[in-house]
Amino acid sequence: MGQKVHPHGLRVGIIKEWDAKWYADKKNFADNLVEDNKIRKFVKKKGAIAGISKIQIERAAKRIKLNIFTAKPGMIIGKGGQGIEALKTELKKIVPDKVILINIVEVKVAEADAQLMAENIALQLEKRISFRRAMKQTIQRAMKSGIKGVKTTCSGRLGGAEIARSESYHEGTIPLQTLRADIDYGFAEADTTYGKIGVKVWVYKGEVLPVKKPVENKEEAKA
């Protein structure tokens, strides 16, 4: 049975970038990776209500730069930048020997961000809202924002059923095999009284076409 590859991982180096932008030798690689994981988990937990879509980490010598993509930048920045300073102080406990820089990037259309959509559906499931209603409402809002297509899947003991199953809804087109297609992917888990329910969201935002270089006139080139 064929399994779906992660849409972001498939397109890295083609139309997508790495979420971790650094290089380390064999000796330091594992430590850096563990640090990255701790930083991501902490920032995600700290800014749970701020709608954090993704966190990019850049490293250079003794410096770490975090690019935090969020739908509500004001909730992270705080009054007069107090939130940023408090976050830096907390992160210093994880990486005490490094200088931390934080850059906040606003997610303009939260309704079209796959990760935020998945987390929104998961939150509704935890509030005992019907999974079908949650998925359909999220899809409708996403399509109104001007995207080309969206697909959502919920897996687990849906509606408290004895046997776990998966249900999907989609609208528009989702060309998962087309490498130039800009596919955004998000995953979240809902902790319900019946157990965990996994939520996956695929969003198709259109094709990313390579920039064509202007062809020089042959006669001008000869001259």
From Swiss-Prot:
Q: How does it assemble?
A: Part of the 30S ribosomal subunit. Forms a tight complex with proteins S10 and S14.
Family matches, as InterPro entries: KH_dom, KH_dom-like_a/b, KH_dom_type_2, KH_sf_prok-type, Ribosomal_S3_C_sf, Ribosomal_uS3_bac-typ, Ribosomal_uS3_C, Ribosomal_uS3_CS
**Cellular component terms per the entry's GO annotation:** cytosolic small ribosomal subunit
Spell out the protein name for this chain: Small ribosomal subunit protein uS3
Which keywords does this Swiss-Prot/TrEMBL entry list?
Answer: Ribonucleoprotein, Ribosomal protein, RNA-binding, rRNA-binding
Instruction: Give the taxonomic lineage as stored in the record.
Output: Bacteria, Bacillati, Bacillota, Clostridia, Eubacteriales
Q: Which SMART domains match?
A: KH (SM00322)
Q: Which GO terms describe its molecular function?
A: mRNA binding; rRNA binding; structural constituent of ribosome
Q: Does the keyword Ribosomal protein apply?
A: yes
Explain the purpose of this protein. Answer: Binds the lower part of the 30S subunit head. Binds mRNA in the 70S ribosome, positioning it for translation.
> What Pfam families does this protein's entry cite?
KH_2, Ribosomal_S3_C
KH type-2 domain span: 39-108
> Highest taxon of the source?
Bacteria
Q: Which CDD domains match?
A: KH-II_30S_S3
Is Mitochondrion one of the keywords UniProt gives this record?
Answer: no
Q: Which gene encodes it?
A: rpsC
Q: Which GO terms describe its biological process?
A: translation
Stated family: Belongs to the universal ribosomal protein uS3 family.
User: Where in the sequence is the signal peptide annotated?
Assistant: none
